[in-house]
Amino acid sequence: MPELPEVEAARRVAQRVARGRRIVDVWCADDPIVFERIPAARWRRALRGRRVRAVKRHGKHLWFELDRRPWPCMHFGMTGGFHTPGRGTLRLVAHGKKGPGLTWPPRFVKLIVKFDDGGELAFADARRLGRARLRVDPAAEPPISLLGFDAWRGLPPPASFKRLVTARSSPMKALLLDQSFAAGVGNWIADEVLYQARIDPRRRAGTLTDEEIRRLRAALARVIAVSVRARNDSDRYPRTWLFHDRWGRNPKAYTARGEKIRHDTIGGRTTAWVPSVQG
């Protein structure tokens, strides 16, 4: 699933293509799942003729601010993403591969928007787990209004962060994946943050010491900032990151530092961690 860094990269692509441009044509698939039963005709009416003022993001959700409401909101699900002609789609760093290629329109396309300068932007989703919605005020309406702080732009100050953590009793891995706590954190980022913070993913949030909470906040800020700056190129992640060696549940996996990696299911998700560091 695209996590915050990938969605931020998608937002930047969309911002570059769409900001300041007027929408001159819209093609919309008849897909009641992805579009949550909003008819294609309504999407065309809502978008055609509108000018894009900005593209915003909160967690894994993004939306387009138009010169008239409602505004389109996107969540990529497991395999969704934006495409532009001749550039394919964004690489999902968790899978280390490109999207479905450079054909246009892309396979599994759900929405194509054409702009007054000739540019185009498409939303495609192979598994149909993504969602496209129309909202009058996206940040004030579900699902975005139900999210916690944005893990990159909205990290709370230390005292507030401590209160949020100590108020919870769930295992730390489950807490980081809870979008009502920190919006945008997914599986590999949660594992990386806990590894760098030296915290056992099974620890209950309310039992963390002040020093552990300080390390947690610092690791969250660092991992998100570095991964966003890398612009979806995981080769630019530090070689000492757990990320590079965590995949595949390999029983013989070790970090670049020679630390043995263990895989467990915690909070319903496969978790890679290093007991010698996080125990």
Language model features with spans:
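Structured catalytic/nucleic-acid-binding cores of DNA maintenance enzymes
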Residues: 1-279
